[in-house]
């Protein structure tokens, strides 16, 4: 009984975040990139993981370009934002990223 209630609480918390949004996908790709980068530092000849990393980098690049068109914010500002997030933390938080994007949108209006 307790286990089922715990699972339902977890599923309700997961539904609060919009997992299909572009911002959430960018954050999750950034976290995956961080994990793969640390993995590749240990396993230098893991070429399959390196290829996966390059694919994820390309996907994130395309999503950032789409997001900059959608929000009418310069792509370079988004790239600087991602670089700042990559340098400051090992894990990027969705809510912080969303707030920073909203701040950039307000600047351009």
UniProtKB/Swiss-Prot annotation:
Keyword Protein transport: no
PROSITE patterns: RIBOSOMAL_S15
InterPro entries to which the protein is assigned, alphabetical: EF_hand_dom, Ribosomal_uS15, Ribosomal_uS15_bac-type, uS15_NS1_RNA-bd_sf
Origin organism lineage: Eukaryota, Viridiplantae, Streptophyta, Embryophyta, Tracheophyta
Span of the signal peptide: none
Primary location group: plastid
Protein name: Small ribosomal subunit protein uS15c
GO cellular component: chloroplast; ribonucleoprotein complex; ribosome
GO MF term set: calcium ion binding; structural constituent of ribosome
GO biological process, one term: translation
Pfam families: Ribosomal_S15
Family statement drawn from the similarity comment of this UniProt entry: Belongs to the universal ribosomal protein uS15 family.
Complexes and interactors: Part of the 30S ribosomal subunit.
CDD domains: Ribosomal_S15p_S13e (cd00353)
UniProt cross-references to PANTHER family, sorted A to Z: RIBOSOMAL PROTEIN S15, BACTERIAL AND ORGANELLAR, SMALL RIBOSOMAL SUBUNIT PROTEIN US15M
Keyword annotations: Chloroplast, Plastid, Ribonucleoprotein, Ribosomal protein
């Amino acid at each position: 009984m307790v286990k089922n209630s715990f699972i339902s609480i977890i599923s309700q918390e997961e539904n609060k975040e919009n997992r299909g949004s572009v911002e959430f996908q960018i954050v999750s790709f950034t976290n995956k990139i961080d994990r793969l980068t640390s993995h590749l530092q240990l396993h230098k000849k893991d070429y399959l993981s390196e290829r996966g990393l390059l694919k994820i980098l390309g996907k994130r690049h395309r999503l950032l370009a789409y997001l900059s068109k959608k929000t009418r914010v310069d792509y370079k500002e988004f790239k600087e934002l991602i670089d700042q997030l990559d340098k400051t933390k090992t894990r990027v938080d969705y809510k912080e990223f969303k707030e920073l994007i909203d701040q950039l949108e307000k600047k351009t209006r």
